[in-house]
């Protein structure tokens, strides 16, 4: 499972302490240094043996993703869930085969309700910030598969 939290670097130890109280612990002794370098905590839920990659979001696009998240009630817990548009943009940016398969599935299920302009604006920002030119083309190629 992947999740993103908005947390400052100096708050990581407090976050780890709070998660440990719920049986969520680092997957390796290097998890803290990996978090510092790559802004992702590699964790493990002990009881279920489920791996959890916790992305340490910060100012910028991740803040915007969180602001646009939709609240879902999951068994009485109110959980913010990234919008389909932002998930598509993030998965196209990641670009792994599994991510692109996920995009195909999201497009198939949500095509009529998606704000494609938002996805395109987000991908354009990624391209400009990262000096890339392939992300909008990927969206075009993936979306052309669905009428």
Role assignments for model-derived ranges:
Residues 1-147:
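Compositionally biased terminal segments of proteins
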């Amino acid at each position: 499972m992947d999740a993103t939290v908005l947390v400052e670097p100096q708050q990581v130890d407090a976050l780890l302490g709070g998660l440990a109280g719920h049986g969520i612990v680092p997957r390796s002794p290097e998890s803290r240094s990996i978090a510092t370098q790559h802004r992702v905590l590699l964790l493990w839920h002990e009881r279920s043996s489920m791996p959890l990659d916790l992305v340490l979001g910060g100012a910028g696009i991740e803040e915007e993703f969180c602001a646009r998240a939709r609240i879902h009630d999951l068994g009485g817990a109110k959980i913010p869930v990234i919008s389909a548009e932002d998930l598509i943009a993030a998965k196209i940016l990641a670009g792994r085969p599994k991510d692109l398969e996920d995009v195909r599935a999201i497009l198939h299920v949500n095509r009529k309700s998606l704000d494609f302009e938002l996805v395109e604006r987000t991908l354009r920002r990624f391209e400009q910030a990262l000096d890339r030119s392939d992300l909008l083309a990927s969206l075009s190629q993936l979306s052309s598969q669905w009428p």
